[in-house]
Amino acid sequence: MRTYDILIIGGGCAGLSLAYHLQKTNTHQKIVILESREQYTNDKTWCFWEKNENLWTSLATKHWDQWSFHRDSDHQTIQHQSQIWKYYYLPAIKYYEYMTKAIRTNSNISLKMNTQVSKITKEKAPLLTPSETVYQLETNNDTYRALEVVDTRPQKKGESLLFQSFYGCHIELQASQSDDCVALMHNMRTDHTSFRFNYILPLSKTHILFEHTRFASEPLSEDLMKKECTSELKRLRIKHQKILRTEYGILPMGLNIKPSQFHTGGQRQGALRDASGYAFLRIQKWADAFSKELIKRSSHLTKPPKKRKKDLQKIMDTLFLKTLKRAPQNSSKIFISLAKNAKADLFSRFMSDQSSLIDKIRIIISMPPWPFLQTLFSNPLQPTTSQKTYD
């Protein structure tokens, strides 16, 4: 049985990105990726803000320099426009095709599709030094051994402050419309249990991605989100020829990440931005740094990296989510205030993890203080997370 140097569980965004960065080093290490899907399809969408052209912007099929916010209660609309930053749309299939093609140029890296990991055991490696161990992974197809394991599968169960549930439709419109501006958060409205809005990407003059999104204390079912998305399309009188495909997902916001006996990537490593759910560029940054860490060390890593200390942005995100959870009826007010007072470039820097300390202070003062002060002075011992299973 072959023993691999590195085994990556999951060939999604994080797993493929790590393998891609490893192959860029021309490594001679034997690496295998185990992916449960039979084949890659255009199953999701990644969006991000960027000011410089790079590989990811070149793979994107659409970008905008304008995005807007809208609240239903008073029909207030705030529009951002940037001369520096652009908002990019990257279909998953473009990413999968590029990454798998690049990975296959290195004969030391293999990708195994339709492979589900059922059991992982850790044991001493008899042919190695006494301090080294080997992992053995049982799958539906074969048994694999590896000196290092990186698990990039999403954590299926965990405590989270909030859950972002969404259902989206790629729609072919009956009539053409402007495709210059993204409806980033439109039709915002709240009740005492959740905050909801519509997210609309005009991919062409006759093709849009329409997503209905809700922030709630528990994940919402696909059937419910589909029903609400359909209702929104009717309410807004969006006339369409046909629905090309659909997307459904649940993003944990403020996930309490469980400790692991081996390395983790993607959502398990904290790639999801707590307050927004944006993850794509964070995953690329992690993959670049972690691939170099794996290669440069003369001996194999024996323990997963220590949990990172909370920085100011993490603290801000946590307070933000606790405030939305405590009083969801304030959500629209908070987001409209943020959109109105934080101009396009500041907003883009903050959303893309490139904000300075001054930027963070400006973000703080752009929002109404009272809801956050109420959260700060509320009972700190009161449980704030929910234990839920999500797919």
Locations of the language-model features?
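N-terminal Rossmann-like FAD-binding beta1-loop-alpha1 element of flavoenzymes
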Residues: 2-32
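N-terminal FAD cofactor-binding segment of flavoenzymes
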Residues: 21-27, 32-74
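Short beta-strand to alpha-helix junction loop
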Residues: 79-101, 152, 216-224
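Predominantly flavin-linked oxidoreductase catalytic cores and closely associated redox partners
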Residues: 106-240, 257
